[in-house]
Amino acid sequence: MYSNKKRQAILLALLAAHCTFYGTNVTAAPVPVTDGKYTADGTDTYDPITHTDTINSIKVSNGAQVSVTAGATTVNGVNSSESLTASSGGQLTVNGSLNATVGLGDTYSTGVGYSGIVANGSGSKIILSGTDNSITSKSTNYKNSESAFFAYNNGEIHVTGDTTTVKVSQSRIVAAQDGASITFSNG
């Protein structure tokens, strides 16, 4: 029979192995996000990313796939461009309810517009499927097509949860161009 310490060592080794190989095509263990910015590149699949603290932004690109499965996700992206971003074939899915403040203040003098939730490029997708989403856009540069949701270059944004509340100041709610699509199929 194994001693208690030996049993604990075996269990910890098994747990570590499970974490290392969790998911599909994973080259690194799933990464818990607790603060700041999360950036996913390459072909890694991180599923799930669970966290309880506020995130400044999530940017997914180059075919990476990120699934956020926490019960509630809070994103405070004020004064950061493209707080939730999928580009170059990246896919971001938020399964839990999303409470996000996104966008940048007035940048018209610089000729630069910043939207909040952005999908750019063919195969790039953002899917919000939480039951109660609340999006507040702080963008104020209406003339540069700033919006709470912005899809372009064949990017896709799909909102499929039960209820989504969007508040804007001077920006658009949605903007899509160059073959992109934004769909709201929630109740």
Regions found by a protein language model. Give the residues of each.
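Short hydrophobic transmembrane-like helices used for membrane targeting/insertion
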Residues: 26, 126-127, 173, 182
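Small-residue (G/S/T/A) turn/hinge positions that recur once per unit in extracellular repeat modules
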Residues: 42-43, 63-66, 71-72, 90, ...
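Extracellular beta-strand/beta-solenoid scaffold signature
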Residues: 29, 35-37, 52-60, 76-88, ...
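Generic detector of low-complexity/intrinsically disordered segments
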Residues: 13-17, 23, 86, 94, ...
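Gram-negative bacterial Sec-dependent N-terminal signal peptides
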Residues: 1-27
